[in-house]
A protein has these predicted regions:
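Beta-strand elements of well-folded, non-transmembrane domains
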Residues: 17-21, 73
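Short, Lys/Arg-enriched N-terminal segments with co-localized hydrophobic residues
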Residues: 1-5
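Active-site-flanking beta-strand signature of metal-NTP-handling nucleotidyl enzymes
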Residues: 10-18, 66
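Short, solvent-exposed loop/turn elements at beta->coil junctions and helix N-caps
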Residues: 53-57
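Short, surface-exposed ligand-recognition loops at beta-strand->loop->(often short) alpha-helix junctions
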Residues: 20-31
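Short coil/turn motifs at beta-sheet boundaries
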Residues: 8-10, 60-62
Length: 114
């Protein structure tokens, strides 16, 4: 529930990407800037209701970004994974050069106030 209204979203995945250098992080940010809208357009057709790419700024001396995906059902989450895997494969050469450490979590939204 958001505020007093039910939303379409009930599942979320959150991924944190940690980079060794600022240059690696900036390259990865550029990849998302170039390709993120296209990926979301594909995911939206499969039930992804929200995509957000963020830079984590409160950890001094570290280089981190994160992604947030929200889905309208468990099936939408499953359906989106193929598109996400295809996206990952399309940038694999860049990923190997950047080599981020990825930490993933999958969440059920219990309360979301705004």
């Amino acid at each position: 529930m958001r505020g007093n209204k039910m939303t379409e979203t009930n599942l979320m995945s959150y991924n944190t990407f940690t980079f060794k250098t600022e240059a690696q992080m900036l390259l990865y940010i550029r990849l998302w800037e170039e390709k993120g809208k296209l990926l979301f357009a594909k995911l939206k057709q499969k039930g992804c209701t929200r995509f957000c790419y963020n830079q984590i700024w409160n950890k001094k001396g570290t280089y981190k970004t994160s992604t947030l995906f929200e889905y309208n059902s468990p099936q939408a989450y499953k359906d989106c994974q193929k598109a996400i895997d295809n996206f990952r494969q399309s940038i694999m050469k860049e990923l190997e050069a950047i080599s981020p450490v990825i930490e993933s979590s999958r969440n059920v939204i219990l309360q979301d106030l705004y």
